[in-house]
Amino acid sequence: MLQRIRWTTILILIQCVLISVGAFAAEEPEEGENFIWVDLGKESEGVLLTQSEQGDGVTEPAVQGGIDCLENPWPYNGPGHNHMYFKIDDSFLFGGKHKAWIVMEYFDSNEAQEIDCQYDSNGAGPVGGAFRGAGDGAFLVVKPGGTDEWLVHIWEIKDGRFENRANGSDFRFSSHGKGAIWINRVWFSTIEPPEDFDPDSPFGIPQAVDPTSKLTTTWAQLKTGKE
């Protein structure tokens, strides 16, 4: 009996050690190193990620649900469908083959039937993969539910190229002519975010970043510089 208890205790200790090693081995989120972001509005701000206007990418400052954001209007005075373009700073990432995640904070309005993400890829898609998206089998489109609330969607990218081939940008959002969309904040990350991503909480599950167990900074702190 005592021997069984002893072995059980040893197994529990081994499991605890393995869990601890896994936790410390996980890559910590670091702004400008493995994730970048932009907060959209009348005066957008961000780190190494910018929204860019195009001939088929026209936006307007807007307020939805009390939140300053950008609207991708439809219909609009431009060619084809309207899109919202984003450019990753080349100093962060340029070319190659990358697994990445794009986190989109959008207003869940029934004015748009869908929201798609098209990105510069190494896979199949228009213009040699420069606009790969849901229509090319990359993932499913977002189907807004009309809750009139701000929600978050995470796009998983498995074959990213991000070489500015999407009309000088790296990815874009669009309803493909099926209504206006509103976007507040966007994050681009080379580490996996949590499925229940909370834009106002630390990136991922709170983790110790040093022996004193200081937690990772929140998005609000990152943007204001406050501790």
Regions picked out by a protein language model, each given a short descriptive name:
Residues A26-S91:
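Glycan-recognition and processing domains
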Residues S91, V103-E111, D120-N122, G160:
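Solvent-exposed strand-to-loop "edge" motifs in beta-rich extracellular domains
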Residues S175-D200, T216:
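Extracellular carbohydrate recognition
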Residues A124-R165:
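Extracellular carbohydrate recognition and processing domains
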Residues T9-S20:
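Bacterial N-terminal signal peptides
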Residues V152-W187:
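Extracellular beta-strand ligand-recognition surfaces/modules
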Residues M84, N110-G123, N167:
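Beta-strand acidic-aromatic groove motif in beta-rich domains, primarily in extracellular
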Residues K87-I102, P144-G146:
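Extracellular/lumenal carbohydrate-interaction signature centered on repeated Trp-anchored short motifs
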